[in-house]
Each structure stands twice: as C-alpha cells, then as structure tokens.
A protein has these predicted regions:
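Right-hand nucleic-acid polymerase module
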Residues: 1, 9-14, 153-326
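Conserved polymerase palm-domain catalytic core
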Residues: 1-157, 320-325
C-alpha cells in the first residue's frame, strides 16, 4: 500500500496506522528530489520490488504464506532555499525564479510474522531488537525481495519526526498483571503504545511562550490587552494535533503556567482570563490524495495545493512589506 501526505495531520495519521498494524520494521528515510525524475523512478522500483499496489486480499495471502509485507509513506515537503532569507525567497518568487526547495520524504515499512521470523536452525523466533538476529531477518527479506533495503526495528532508530512532532513509544505502567487485565490493557482492540508528542525544541519554545504570556500581565496596564493575548495563546494550545502524547504535554505546560501565575501574583490565573482547555482528539480523516494513487497524480495534486498556498502567503508578505515601507 502507498500512502501520501503533505501536512503533519495526514502524515502522523498514516504512521500511527503502521504502528497499529504492526509494521514495526522501517528502512532509513529517503529524501528525493521532485525537480528531477528521481522520486518517480525510486517509487516505481519500490512498487515492483515490494508489491506495493497489491490488494488487501493479496497482501493477506502473502502473510498466510509467511512472507513479509510492505507499505510506503510518501510525504511532500517544501522549504525556503538554503542560504536565503524569507524576504529574499519571496522576492525570487515575485520574479518567477526558483525560491523553494520541494522534496519527497519516503518511508518504507515492513510487517513480519512469527512464522517468517522462525529460525530453522535454532527453531526460535528471531528478535527484531537483537543486532545479530536483525541481520538474519534482513537476509530473509532479501531472499524474498532481491535488492531490498536494510530494515531496522522502529524502536531502535532515531524518532520519525514531522514538523513539531516526533514518534515515541509510551512505557506501560508498572502494575500487576491482575490490574492490567482488569483495565483490559492487553485485550483492547487496535491499541498501540506508540504516539506522537512535541519535540524537545517545540516543547521548550511553547513553554517559554507561556512564561512570556504570564510575565507580561504585570507590564500591561490595559488588562484587556492581556486577556486578548491569553485568548490567542489558549487557541494556539488547542490547535495542536490531539495525540495522547501531545495532550499530556499541553496539560503539563498549562499546569506550569497556572503555578507560575500564582507564585508571581498570588492570585488564581482563572480570575484573570484563564479557562479550561478544550484539547482535541484525533479522528479518522479522509486523505486528500487517495491511497495507491500513481505518483504522478499525487505530485500534481500537491503542486496544485502548494501553488495556491504560496500565492496566499506571498500576498500576505507583500502587504506586510508595503506597510513597513510606509
């Protein structure tokens, strides 16, 4: 199966789908150039090598035959050209010159079964977290898919990240088996202990922003200005993706800010504009690009969306620049 995305919400959702369905082996991240045919050529090779366009029924038959199965995540990205400031990029954009770096980030995932992982010599199931066993696993994959990439266990590589978010694994609470069974920890359907959270950098930036909102309260003579600032800040907190790891972090941030306000002014924050946050939960979303679409169709869709988005951002930059000049 091939999944496409160009915003964090869709990308993180696809990765969570991989984790839920036990696609826990991953190849290194590939960064492919969209301004050449590099991305198209690589994806065509992967489709043939890993049978990515097979139906769910065909994939199921492979699993029954003790074969590994694969999925590909294709994430479209863009950024300012290296070495150029924001203004320089928009000036180039105004002249119809190349101003942005447009790339594809590609992730190959693999799902295996105990039957596939069974070592015929030792009659033991190979461990994905053992280095020597992982070499054997990759050899077994190579025998079925010649020229295959090297795969690693998802928990042993650098966290997959997207924008302000990174994939992490939550540890199960240290409770007795009886307590866990009472809460259906092991019997709950489609549950994964993987989630997304803010990166350390994003978390620290959000923490500092919260401190500024609290500390500026004293310097704002017009308290309505402080209230407006808080309202905007709370909306920003509520705008993060609603994964449990993120919600937990936002809750921690909010608690720290309430305590800071109390310590600084000896007054409850809720008496001065604070309110209970309404944090979202992730829901099933319909992807704007249909799964298993051809790469050419997916790229065309992304470029259309990108052009519209860049034009809007350019107009905002232009209006801001004109206002600054006046």
């Amino acid at each position: 199966m091939i999944y496409y995305s160009y915003v964090p919400k869709d990308f993180t959702k696809h990765v969570m789908g991989m984790m839920t369905n036990e696609y826990d082996l991953v190849a290194k991240k590939f960064i492919l150039n969209m301004n050449t045919d590099e991305a198209s050529r690589m994806i065509s090779k992967w489709i043939e090598r890993y049978h990515l366009l097979e139906t769910a029924q065909q994939t199921y038959r492979r699993r029954l035959n003790s074969e590994p199965v694969f999925s590909l995540l294709v994430h479209f990205t863009y950024s300012y050209l290296p070495g150029l400031s924001e203004s320089e990029c928009w000036e180039k954009f105004d002249k119809n010159e190349p101003a942005f770096l447009v790339q594809v980030e590609a992730y190959l995932f693999c799902r295996t079964s105990d039957a596939f992982l069974l070592d015929e010599k030792t009659q033991k199931v190979l461990s994905k977290t053992d280095k020597q066993d992982l070499l054997k696993i990759n050899r077994k994959i190579f025998e079925i898919c010649p020229s295959s990439e090297s795969f690693s266990y998802i928990g042993e590589v650098n966290p997959i990240s997207c924008g302000r978010y990174e994939l992490v694994r939550l540890t199960k609470p240290k409770k007795s088996i009886k307590e866990l069974q009472a809460k259906n920890w092991t019997n709950e359907k489609h549950v994964t202990d993987w989630t997304w959270r803010l990166t350390d950098k994003a978390y620290k930036e959000q923490l500092e922003q919260g401190k500024r909102v609290v500390l500026r309260f004293q310097s704002l003579i017009e308290k309505n200005a402080s209230l407006d600032e808080k309202k905007a800040y709370f909306r920003a907190l509520e705008g993060y993706l609603g994964y449990r790891g993120v919600r937990q972090q936002i809750g921690n941030l909010y608690h720290l800010e309430k305590r800071l306000f109390k310590d600084k002014y000896n007054q409850p924050w809720f008496d001065h504009g604070a309110r209970t946050l309404k944090l979202s939960y992730m829901k099933k979303l319909k992807s704007p690009i249909v799964n298993n679409s051809s790469y050419q169709e997916a790229e065309a869709h992304f470029r259309s969306v990108l052009t519209e988005d860049l034009n809007k951002k350019y107009e905002k930059w232009k209006a801001k620049s004109n206002k600054t000049e006046v």
